[in-house]
Amino acid sequence: MINFNNVKIFSGNSNLELAKKIAEKAGLQLGKAEIQRFKDGEVYIEIEETVRGRDVFVVQSTSEPVNENLMELLIFVDALKRASAKTINVIIPYYGYARQDRKSKPREPITSKLVANLLTTAGVNRVVAMDLHADQIQGFFDIPLDHMQALPLMARYFKEKGFKGDEVVVVSPDVGGVKRARKLAEKLDCKIAIIDKRRPKPNMSEVMNLIGEVEGKIAIFIDDMIDTAGTITNGADAIAQRGAKEVYACCTHAVFSDPAIERLEKSVLKEIVITDSIALPERKKIDKIKILSVDSVFANAIDRITNNQSVSELFN
């Protein structure tokens, strides 16, 4: 049970609807804050209620426009720190810059680590994120980070559709996603398949080979994010050509950079299951897309954090 007198929750502009749902699930009122832009683009934030001595949560996905939303979050944290908040906990449903988690070429930055440093220096006491692109990002922080998962929601959704057992196969779009695919396959009591993908250029992918059996089965792709949708749609075509009965896809983060929607609309995919970790504009809400809300996941995390209980037990 959350101590409502000691806890406050606020939202930036990136995903206000999700923040409202999280607050409602947690039994909290969304805090009042004025967020404006000066004519030159600078961010101005004023907290319009007292936060002195309170445990404060701020909901903000660092999605497109990434730099705007990140800077807004940092300024929000600074305002809370200067207003004497007891603890500042940031809920980042989608953690931008997560794909820049290592040096693959000489003289490249590791921007995921830079963002972690910026958040910590700004005054964040705890980060609550969901399905980070790379697990090692958790180690970039010198403050507690709770890593939420959307996979149980997706498993429940597909189970309710009757998708389980030998008639289903979970497909990883690349070798790096095998661990994620195996977890979903365990929950659906089915086998996995793996696509061997070669990427000649950024945001371009080419399907080369398939490991596993898909003929006559319902195939479910799973990934942490879909960006331009080239990987998923090329993979879906390859699976369909090899005799899959139906092809579905699911991901936590619907980045959906152009031309993702066009590709998904034209693809053989029957349904794309996503979460609301990123606010999806109305123009991108096509009939094929099913949105699952992660509001209860973060509301439960708030409850456990404020009561000094284990957050990881939510996923055991």
Curated annotation (Swiss-Prot):
Cofactor binding: number and manner:
Binds 2 Mg(2+) ions per subunit.
- Species lineage, top-down? Bacteria, Fusobacteriati, Fusobacteriota, Fusobacteriia, Fusobacteriales
The positions annotated for binding Mg(2+) 1 are 133
What family does this belong to? Belongs to the ribose-phosphate pyrophosphokinase family. Class I subfamily.
- Name its pathway: Metabolic intermediate biosynthesis; 5-phospho-alpha-D-ribose 1-diphosphate biosynthesis; 5-phospho-alpha-D-ribose 1-diphosphate from D-ribose 5-phosphate (route I): step 1/1
What is the official name of this protein in its record?
A: Ribose-phosphate pyrophosphokinase
What does it catalyze?
Answer: D-ribose 5-phosphate + ATP = 5-phospho-alpha-D-ribose 1-diphosphate + AMP + H(+)
Which sites are catalytic?
197
Q: Would the keyword Cytoplasm be found if you checked this record's keyword annotation?
A: yes
**SUPFAM superfamilies to which the protein is assigned, alphabetical:** PRTase-like
Key words, A-Z: ATP-binding, Cytoplasm, Kinase, Magnesium, Metal-binding, Nucleotide biosynthesis, Nucleotide-binding, Transferase
Q: Where in the cell is it found?
A: Cytoplasm
